[in-house]
């Protein structure tokens, strides 16, 4: 490229390749600054839809005098999202494997339409060791290879997945209860029962409540992880517990189920309060036993008043604690890799990614410490037990939370390879 710059004057009158044929340099706009070419673009595709990716590719191809190959293009199947695409819907994360395949095919069509010579999908396989800007504060970056952080989008751009378990995962959230055993049970009153298991990616729960009837009633699962904070009362839902809970899992139908976190233990507040509320989170922190529980959100875009001139603009966030209903078994015809929970009569089967519960390194059972007590941000403590309960919200007394033992796996990671649905989509496209 340096040689091109040095010899640009000599090349001014030479013909160039426009992606389809050899034409004069003046016809293509080759060498024109990209910023100028962007001002000339209309940003629409052939169907009349706004497509900034195609517009960028057209400009990039016009700027150069040689064939252009797009060295990487891709989207992530991670549960977490780092950026929302405003016009094509090809988000950086929170896309199912089928949506990933569709997005890759659309990107390839744009690459070909723009006149580029080709491109390379990013990437062949998932990468557990990766980090991303809107979750890296929440995890131990020295330990990311030893667990699968489904909240970090950067780890899941691959066409090949590394799923937990040597041959299969310990649980598939699909409504088939045959994989659950008596050893998994934490409590069983006859009218209610709760079981738990876990692997390198998720905590899995199976909850039974008499009369639940595929979500006709509500169900609440309080969770206590840290001894430093938590509340015995959840103001949001009017729930009382016999231990201070840090999270409440609210199963409220297919469309309104979510995990909420006690305000004191909300990591977004501790790390991004200035960006979201233009204030210092540490000047007046919530009480350690505050009964207010908040939606769990991820930062998507920090405000840019210097660029926009809007000094009242707040940063963009989205609710990552909201749960998606569906079948999460890869062998099922209705498989949705983003599905969090499914009903099965009076049962609900669900999975929670570790980071959503403020685990910084589950391979060592390391969680977030209190952000405000002699700390300034995310520090870690280690636990060997968490506590969970189950209620329909109509109990007169306090809901009992039962212990669940946690055992770290250290560096001994179990995984198996699986081709994603997006692999099949690209194979069909490139046949």
Predicted regions and their residues:
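Surface-exposed, glycine/proline- and aromatic-rich loop segments on solvent-exposed faces
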Residues: 186-305, 368-392
């Amino acid at each position: 490229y340096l040689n091109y710059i040095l010899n640009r004057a000599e090349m001014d009158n030479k013909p160039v390749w426009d992606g389809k044929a050899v034409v004069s340099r003046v016809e293509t706009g080759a060498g024109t600054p990209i910023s100028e070419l962007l001002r000339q673009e209309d940003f629409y595709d052939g169907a009349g839809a706004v497509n900034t990716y195609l517009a960028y590719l057209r400009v990039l191809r016009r700027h150069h005098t040689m064939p252009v190959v797009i060295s990487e293009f891709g989207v992530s199947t991670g549960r977490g999202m780092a950026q929302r695409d405003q016009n094509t819907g090809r988000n950086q994360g929170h896309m199912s494997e089928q949506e990933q395949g569709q997005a890759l095919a659309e990107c390839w069509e744009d690459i070909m339409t723009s006149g580029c010579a080709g491109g390379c999908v990013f990437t062949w396989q998932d990468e557990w060791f990766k980090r991303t800007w809107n979750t890296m504060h929440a995890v131990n970056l020295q330990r990311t290879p030893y667990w699968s952080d489904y909240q970090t989008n950067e780890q899941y751009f691959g066409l090949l997945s590394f799923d937990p378990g040597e041959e299969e995962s310990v649980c598939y959230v699909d409504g088939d209860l045959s994989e659950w055993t008596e050893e998994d049970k934490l409590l069983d009153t006859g009218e209610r029962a709760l079981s738990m298991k876990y692997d390198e990616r998720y905590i899995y729960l199976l909850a039974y409540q008499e009369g639940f009837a595929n979500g006709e009633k509500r169900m609440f699962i309080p969770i206590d992880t840290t001894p430093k904070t938590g509340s015995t009362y959840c103001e949001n839902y009017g729930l009382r517990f016999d231990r201070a809970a840090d999270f409440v899992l609210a199963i409220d139908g297919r469309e309104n189920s979510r995990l909420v976190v006690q305000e004191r233990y909300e990591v977004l507040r501790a790390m991004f309060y200035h960006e979201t509320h233009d204030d210092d989170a540490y000047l007046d922190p919530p009480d350690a036993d505050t009964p207010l529980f908040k939606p769990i959100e991820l930062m998507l875009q920090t405000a840019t008043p210097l660029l926009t001139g809007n000094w009242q603009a707040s940063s963009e966030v989205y609710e990552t604690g909201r749960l998606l209903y569906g079948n999460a078994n890869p062998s099922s015809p209705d498989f949705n890799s983003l599905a969090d929970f499914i009903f099965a009569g009076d049962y609900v089967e669900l999975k929670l990614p570790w980071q959503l519960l403020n685990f910084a390194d589950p391979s060592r059972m390391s969680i977030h410490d209190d952000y405000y007590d002699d700390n300034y941000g995310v520090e870690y403590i280690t636990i060997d037990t968490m506590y969970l309960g189950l209620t329909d919200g109509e109990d007169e007394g306090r809901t009992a939370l039962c212990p669940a033992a946690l055992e770290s796996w250290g560096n001994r990671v179990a995984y198996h390879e699986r081709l994603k649905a997006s692999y099949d989509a690209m194979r069909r496209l490139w046949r």
